[in-house]
Swiss-Prot record:
Belongs to the G-protein coupled receptor 1 family. Disulfide bonds join 100-192. It comes from the Eukaryota. This is Olfactory receptor 3A3. GO terms for cellular component: plasma membrane. It comes from Pan troglodytes (Chimpanzee). The gene is OR3A3. It is a multi-pass membrane protein.
């Protein structure tokens, strides 16, 4: 630990991440499982992205947002899993203070972007189903890019605010984090100075980035369901519900795990439940998303099959 200039307090130079398991035998199992999950997630999401790029039929607003979501999923798992794999290989559980802050920043940047992107996707479905005559006008390429740019700006501002606010806290020790990556609730527990401002910022962020988007998504889909029920064609209703069902499943999993993680700031210490939710947020969610969207979408399935045929013909 290093002494802070001008004070009698000490600053933690690095943290110790306890990880998912402590026994060496189980660490080998965890390494294999995480490596498998990482390869499946990156492969699945990049395949969907490639299919969207090469298939002209998928050059629509819905798939533009889905392609961006695939990039986010790859980024989300890359922020946490490779670093953990490195620690398991080297048998080192420490992470430097700066690396911890960097991980936290990028995690919240990508998670924040996820919030806004899922909201944009709900707005896209609302316009496509409830306002079909003006859809191409209200959701043109300029609007799509603007929505993504605004989402990145808001997510960046949120992540930077939390990271800067965290640098004002004093960490005097102990420096043991009962988790496998750096996040706000666990770091708040280690602070020897008041975290009241930080928790207030997190509360405001939750209102702006979770509650407001969730309300917007709920209202949008209430209108969508009402409009779909008025469709006379059974095939049309099935296709609309299939597309919307995939998105709602992803929204439910994402917000469900997020609420559990950040609405428990009053708890005294981290538990294995927090680690389980962390695995769901950073590993399971990104791995499931391609499966959810491709299983219920014949267009994506067709594009992926074409991609495989092209790949085989090239080899």
């Amino acid at each position: 630990m290093e002494s802070e200039a001008g004070t009698n307090r000490t600053a933690v130079a690095e943290f110790m991440l306890l990880g998912l398991v402590q026994t060496e035998e189980m660490q080998s199992v965890i390494f294999v499982l995480l490596l498998f999950a990482y390869l499946v997630t990156t492969g699945g999401n990049l395949s969907i992205l490639a299919a969207i790029l090469v298939e002209p039929k998928l050059h629509t607003p819905m798939y533009f947002f889905l392609g961006n979501l695939s990039v986010l999923d790859v980024g989300c798992i890359t922020v946490t899993v490779p670093a953990m794999l490195g620690r398991l290989l080297s048998h080192k559980s420490t992470i430097s203070y700066d690396a911890c802050l960097s991980q936290l920043f990028f995690f919240h940047l990508l998670a924040g972007m996820d919030c806004f992107l899922l909201t944009a996707m709900a707005y896209d479905r609302f316009l496509a189903i409830c306002r079909p005559l003006t859809y191409s006008t209200h959701m043109n390429q300029r609007v799509q890019r603007m929505l993504v740019a605004v989402s990145w700006t808001c997510a960046f501002t949120n992540a930077l605010t939390h990271t800067i606010a965290l640098t004002t806290l004093n960490f005097c020790g102990p420096s043991v984090i009962n988790h496998f990556y750096c996040d706000l609730p666990q770091l708040f527990q280690l602070s020897c100075s008041s975290t009241q401002l930080n928790e207030l910022l997190l509360f405001v962020a939750a209102a702006v980035m979770a509650v407001a988007p969730l309300v917007f998504i709920s209202v949008s889909y209430a209108h969508v369901v009402a409009a779909v029920l008025q469709i006379h064609s059974a095939e049309g209703r099935k296709k609309a519900f299939s597309t919307c069902g995939s998105h709602l499943t992803v929204v439910g999993i994402f917000y469900g795990t997020g609420v559990f993680s950040y609405m428990r700031l009053g708890s005294v210490e981290s538990s294995d439940k927090d680690k389980g939710v962390g695995v769901f947020m950073t590993v399971i969610n990104p791995m499931l998303n391609p499966l959810i969207y491709s299983l219920r979408n014949t267009d994506v399935q067709g594009a992926l099959c074409q991609l495989l045929v092209v790949k085989r013909s090239l080899t």
